[in-house]
Amino acid sequence: IFKKIHDGLINAFGGEVGEFILGGAPVNPDIEKWFKKIKLPYTVGYGMTEATPLLAYAGSSEYVAGSCGKPVDCAVVRIDSDDPQHIVGEIQAKGDNICLGYYKNPEASADAFTEDGFLRTGDLGLFDADGNLYIKGRSKSMILSANGQNIYPEEVEAVVNSQPYVQESVVVDRASKLVALVYLDQEALRKDGLDQEEVSDLPERIRINSDRQLPNYSQIAKVEIVDQPFEKTPKMSIKRFLYK
């Protein structure tokens, strides 16, 4: 059956596919496992417009699940951390593919680069021993727990989003407790015919099942259902600053 699914997907894209390149947002681990099962040739890249646009990539045969490949040859990528393999830090890059600054905006340009000319991406990450890059989240969205642990809401959201009937989520900090705002998959609810009582039980089910997969310091205290999809940027990133 896995081969049949694989062949169906390849044929849907014309029958001749080298590899699928994913980017723009973290890939759900369960989806990655499914891709592996059906032997779909895929990889994940990382970059930004200021890097025209690629900073890290690995071909599907070398790609390590959960990573976004290794720095491209034309760029030097570093982690602003005393221990880039174990302590998360900002991802910074320098190279011929990096922009020189923002047009007619010297203040933004000055803020975007370090004194030694590295672009501050605003993303947080780690390297493994083989040089693969792992994105942990955005520096602006990081939450500091009451006991001093760094919590990356994107990682918590990936777990929440893997739960049945969850379409998307945003994790926020309220009085040092994590609250997951969840928009449910309306089509899945209709297809499975859930009644009102079953829908009312979903928030607690989502919380319990998510917390089983999360470390103690990033446990979710509450799940709240929202009525509308989250507002997005033109790049389809959630405008998380709108949600508290």
Please give the residue ranges for each predicted region.
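Conserved C-terminal "lid"/linker of ANL adenylate-forming enzymes
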Residues: 143, 168, 176, 207-244
